[in-house]
Regions:
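General beta-strand recognition
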Residues: 89, 106-107
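Acidic, proline/glycine-rich low-complexity IDRs
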Residues: 139-182
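A surface-exposed partner-binding patch
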Residues: 1-99, 166, 170-182
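Charged, low-complexity surface segments at secondary-structure and domain boundaries
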Residues: 15-24, 111-115, 141-148, 161
Length: 182
């Protein structure tokens, strides 16, 4: 997966524009791949409705703010000792972060205690394209949840099929669907 299909999918849900390194406000160095992603895809603070939750994909200018509560304490801005320096939150679904780490993107369900990461995407472009695909799925379908607010089986199957097309792998699609709680 590269920038072009990821950007095309995101553009159906929000705005994208090239963003340069000068828009990064953080005190630490970002990996070159993230600058490339923001230059080529350039999500402009995209909010994606995923069922009852909202996924946030920040612009480069707001990426540092996305680290608050994970990397640093929200009031004191003191660095959390249990958050490795090479983890960068590049998106979130409510309070659950998508973490860029060594080229891949991991998902960690928000909870107390140690972070338990699950690798969901081989690169940030797959993450962007997948989140857009999921957002487009929820935009297309109504009444997708049962009375217990679980995704109905036929819709879960459709979402898995949509992601299978993207990944060219049903196993990867099922992994994403399961980890995101569908």
């Amino acid at each position: 997966m590269n920038a072009k299909p990821a950007k095309e999918l995101l553009l159906q849900l929000g705005q994208c524009s090239p963003q340069d390194t000068g828009q990064w406000t953080g005190a630490y160095k970002l990996p070159p791949e993230l600058f490339e992603y923001y230059r080529e895809v350039g999500p402009d603070d995209i909010y994606i409705e995923i069922g009852a939750e909202t996924c946030t994909i920040p612009s480069l200018a707001k990426l540092e703010n996305q680290q608050v509560g994970y990397r640093v304490h929200p009031r004191t801005t003191e660095r959390f000792s249990n958050w490795p320096g090479h983890w960068i939150v590049v998106a979130s679904i409510e309070a659950s972060p998508m973490i860029y780490c060594d080229g891949a993107v991991f998902y960690a369900k928000a909870r107390k205690g140690e972070w338990m990461l699950n690798k969901l995407f081989d690169n940030i472009y797959f993450m962007a394209a997948s989140l857009a695909t999921i957002g487009l799925f929820f935009r297309k379908w109504v009444e997708v949840f049962d009375e217990n607010y679980n995704l109905k089986s036929e819709h879960c199957e459709q979402l898995t099929n949509d992601l299978t097309e993207l990944f060219d792998s049903k196993a990867k699609a099922e992994l994403v669907v399961a980890n995101l709680g569908f």
